[in-house]
Amino acid sequence: MPRKKAAAAAWEEPSSGNGTARAGPRKRGGPAGRKRERPERCSSSSGGGSSGDEDGLELDGAPGGGKRAARPATAGKAGGAAVVITEPEHTKERVKLEGSKCKGQLLIFGATNWDLIGRKEVPKQQAAYRNLGQNLWGPHRYGCLAGVRVRTVVSGSCAAHSLLITTEGKLWSWGRNEKGQLGHGDTKRVEAPRLIEGLSHEVIVSAACGRNHTLALTETGSVFAFGENKMGQLGLGNQTDAVPSPAQIMYNGQPITKMACGAEFSMIMDCKGNLYSFGCPEYGQLGHNSDGKFIARAQRIEYDCELVPRRVAIFIEKTKDGQILPVPNVVVRDVACGANHTLVLDSQKRVFSWGFGGYGRLGHAEQKDEMVPRLVKLFDFPGRGASQIYAGYTCSFAVSEVGGLFFWGATNTSRESTMYPKAVQDLCGWRIRSLACGKSSIIVAADESTISWGPSPTFGELGYGDHKPKSSTAAQEVKTLDGIFSEQVAMGYSHSLVIARDESETEKEKIKKLPEYNPRTL
């Protein structure tokens, strides 16, 4: 199986682990630097979940190729006005979204020295926090959450921060906060879950975490964003280093029902099944047939970031002989993002993937980056469709409609990659209820059990307990959670979060026996 060379992989993975450095002399697209003029092209509408004008994308030959469809300049670029998606009030749906039906107590295990996660050492400006937080090798409960019932936990494969939504729909956050991604109005690290005051008047139904940014969705379908906005990943129409308080994104279309965040980009889906993306276009992960790359002055490479949500207008399939055909009438039902790739599940149970192709994470049996959503062939057969999708840092998962779990990409990037979807034999016959991926570890709630695996080094996110093996290449039951029913699992870069059901007295007793974690604070 071909494997991405280390040198090539360096293009994607941060060289210093701090999430900004990249190989080569490239500069990340910032507000500085003159944007070069691009020739206008005719546009025609095609694909997508509903009508509405949108850039037609040229599909002569392979998509991408650095081409981009012409469009009006976005705010902050050449002084043009941002093109904000707007739906007239009388045709706008009125929705009241429901949050998850789960109820339980939050458990955490893994790395909790938030500023050290994914880095060799704590940065100088965070030096005071150097010795705060430890690796929790088994499940713990937070002392400060006694009596708080949780319905959703959220983190991300690139994230060193976490969120929880209470049964009342209130959003709490904690962890790394260098860019204000916790939404508390400052950039101070927070050791244990704390209510986001700026959203206390809203009922939050779901949320998503990028590397240093956060999106929150209200019950009426509005989206609030906070954290890093250097690449426009907050969708506020500008590029700024940090936005520490929740701000509503520049979008006035149909209500949003689903969201996902990659490392430095975001995806939102409306109630009609249209998909919109914004942020860093570097590997084509926004799906607009371009990687947004251009040469600025002094031969510097910069990126033309999308600063407001823009519709993903075209979906394609490639035939065996290399022909590219548009796939019309795609109605999106779910979306998931890895560090630099995106997966979509549509109403016909088909899966599309695009963005960074390294390690085979797109499932197209090749490592090419894809600039527009491309059909993953395996799930395009009657009875073979997908029912759930999940994206890891460098891998992808799907659960088929008959319940089989499929995997492609790589969790351990120093070993063989899986270039197309393959059944996960270890979990054959298990009913997958919830799955989450960290940087290289996986955790699954299946039937009555919790299962995890991941290569070394790990930091406790597998939950096997003290004095037990720290890593496992094969799926293993998490024995420390025996008798505890996991309603939902979530994973950050190297920590795990579980909602433990606490309906019966026996369940409450089991949870009570777990150690309490009361982190030291400054």
Curated annotation (Swiss-Prot):
The keyword Isomerase does not apply. Residues 24-36 have a biased composition (Basic residues). The modification Phosphothreonine is found at T20, T342. Gene3D superfamilies: Regulator of chromosome condensation 1/beta-lactamase-inhibitor protein II (2.130.10.30). RCC1 repeats lie at residues 103-165, 168-219, 221-271, 273-347, 348-401, 403-447, 448-501. Coiled coil: none annotated. The modification Phosphoserine is found at S16, S43, S44, S45, S46, S50, S51. One of its GO terms (molecular function) is microtubule binding. InterPro entries: RCC1/BLIP-II, RCC2, Reg_chr_condens. It is a peripheral membrane protein. Keywords: Acetylation, Cell cycle, Cell division, Cell membrane, Centromere, Chromosome, Cytoplasm, Cytoskeleton, Guanine-nucleotide releasing factor, Membrane, Microtubule, Mitosis, Nucleus, Phosphoprotein, Repeat. Induction: Induced by TP53/p53 in response to oxidative stress and DNA damage. Residues 1-83, 502-522 are annotated as: Disordered. Residues 318-325 are annotated as: Required for interaction with RAC1. Residues 71-82 have a biased composition (Low complexity). One of its GO terms (biological process) is chromosome passenger complex localization to kinetochore. It is found in: Nucleus, Nucleolus; Nucleus; Cytoplasm, Cytoskeleton; Chromosome, Centromere. The modification N6-acetyllysine is found at K92, K124, K293, K377. Residues 502-515 have a biased composition (Basic and acidic residues). Interacts with RAC1. Interacts with nucleotide-free and with GDP and GTP-bound forms of RAC1, with a slight preference for GDP-bound RAC1. Binds preferentially to the nucleotide-free form of RAC1. Interacts with CORO1C. Interacts with microtubules. Multifunctional protein that may affect its functions by regulating the activity of small GTPases, such as RAC1 and RALA. Required for normal progress through the cell cycle, both during interphase and during mitosis. Required for the presence of normal levels of MAD2L1, AURKB and BIRC5 on inner centromeres during mitosis, and for normal attachment of kinetochores to mitotic spindles. Required for normal organization of the microtubule cytoskeleton in interphase cells. Functions as guanine nucleotide exchange factor (GEF) for RALA. This is Protein RCC2. It comes from Homo sapiens. The lineage of its organism: Eukaryota, Metazoa, Chordata, Craniata, Vertebrata. The gene is RCC2.
